[in-house]
Amino acid sequence: MSQEEVVFEESKQGIKIVFWGATMAGKTTALSLFHAIKKREDPENVYNFLKLEDKATERTIGFDQATFGLGTGTGREFKYHLFTTPGQDRFKSMRKIVVNGLHGIIVVLDSESARWEENKTSLTELFEILEDKLLNGEVKLQIMLNKMDLPVGTRISAADVGRLMVEAGVSDKLRDTFASVHEVSCLEALQALKETWSSGNWNPKSRPQPVQRIIMPIQQVIRDILVAELSKN
């Protein structure tokens, strides 16, 4: 069994969450940042971290995956698995494989105005694959709007995401999913991590705002999944 097959088998136990978005939107960077933060704050609950990328272009060519533990207070080990999907057009079939069996999804939108069409195509494809599960609440959804460090005038804001969804044909479908749009900058979060760690002033209770913005949608989708699972019992 290959490493990729092992990862998929293990993800059947626990929570599976997928980062979805157009190529170069920031999916791998967001996952890498979260992994780095958890490794510093809670290393005992950080497991494998697998990256499959083209070294020349630094683009994901399969999927990225990281596994983390979640304390339950009962002594029972519980894991959540974070995946990214490859964004390039040629990997559409791979994206369908990666989202199989997921519990939650984080859509990463690229705020650069020039990437409007790529974002729209990505949203349309997502609903072609997961519409029923998103609409019935089986799959929980949060949205990251990345690259908010770009100059105003060259990027969109959270206020523009509604229009993007209308053009993608998913606005009405998303109305009842209770998804929040989180404005983030992976670049600013990375810079904040480097500065805080080099100064020795890292405090999990007062993380820099750019870092906290990356963590919030991940924590929210995990919380939504757990609440839904507990309500079944």
What residue spans do the PLM features occupy?
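Canonical P-loop GTPase G-domain recognition
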Residues: 151-230
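Conserved G1/Walker A P-loop phosphate-binding module
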Residues: 2-55
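Conserved Switch II/interswitch segment of TRAFAC-class P-loop GTPases
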Residues: 88, 101-123, 149-156
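Short, well-ordered amphipathic alpha-helices
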Residues: 34-35, 65-69, 122-131, 159-169
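Conserved beta-strand segments of the P-loop GTPase G domain that flank and frequently precede/overlap
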Residues: 82-84, 106-110, 142-146
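Switch I (G2) and immediately adjacent beta-strands of P-loop GTPase domains
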Residues: 47-90
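A short helix->loop->beta-strand "cap" motif at the edges of active sites that frequently abuts
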Residues: 130-140
